Amino acid sequence: MAMIEVQHLQKNFVKTVKEPGLKGALRSFIHPEKQTFEAVKDLTFEVPKGQILGFIGANGAGKSTTIKMLTGILKPTSGFCRINGKIPQDNRQDYVKDIGVVFGQRTQLWWDLALQETYTVLKEIYDVPDSLFHKRMDFLNEVLDLKEFIKDPVRTLSLGQRMRADIAASLLHNPKVLFLDEPTIGLDVSVKDNIRRAITQINQEEETTILLTTHDLSDIEQLCDRIFMIDKGQEIFDGTVSQLKETFGKMKTLSFELVSGQSHLVSHYEGLPDMTIDRQGNSLNIEFDSSRYQSADIIKQTLSDFEIRDLKMVDTDIEDIIRRFYRKEL
């Protein structure tokens, strides 16, 4: 059974169109013009138990609206979603015991309480038995290394410490599904690595299903089993990182270092379709569609055109592919 099941999910918002000027304002007040905006359009997908799904898209793509429906904050206009067999909008008090939510830019911790006291309050909110609470705290202390600051007030924690503390708070009641929204935002490289290792360990040891939204594409590449990408509320890709690269990573780059004194020479490939030439000093970069051109032919021809000191092949990485999606180049 899928841990997350989404079928034909739709969310519409109605907004009032205001006309400019005093007359327009009066007209809008007396006879307001309404427009329907489709934030999420007919989304359908499933996430099996234990999978880490990267749920990504540009700003305004509909990610936050979808997450709010999955967590029960918003009610769908049509369609439905089930988390662990439960409809999020039905009996929310029972449903929230199955999920954990972390928002990178907002904390669920009490600012003036010591972190340990915060966890004690959450224990009562989620009705966690004493025996399970102590077991969970031991596990979370080990995975997230909370011991050094667990007695400190939350307001004194660094951003990295607070993020670890927030993740622990969301996992205290042992949820089956964890929603992570930008969990590494604003963190330095070493802290990001620690957070990623902790997420991976939690996923592997507890089979926690994780839905991750992030603009840090290193999070996607290092954590996710699968990518679900949306744009304007609609699905545009669903598959693994390797499938994304195979499908859209056809553009490759050959980088040549030329022997000096050849600025007057021109590449044989100047002006050809599906090929971009970038020439700066003694550096020559040829970006090409690998489904149309063979790298061996390009190397052979370029060796004929120029005297080459060095060359290397650069594959298109996931960051470049997704950036092209956002720019509508793919």
Say what each PLM segment does.
Residues 21-29, 120, 124, 131-149:
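Conserved ABC ATPase "signature" region
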Residues 79-90, 95-96:
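Conserved ABC transporter NBD signature motif
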Residues 112, 153-157:
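Conserved ABC ATPase signature
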Residues 174:
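Conserved catalytic motifs of ABC-family nucleotide-binding domains
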Residues 178-182:
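Catalytic Walker B motif of ABC-type/P-loop ATPase nucleotide-binding domains
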Residues 196-289:
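ABC transporter nucleotide-binding domain
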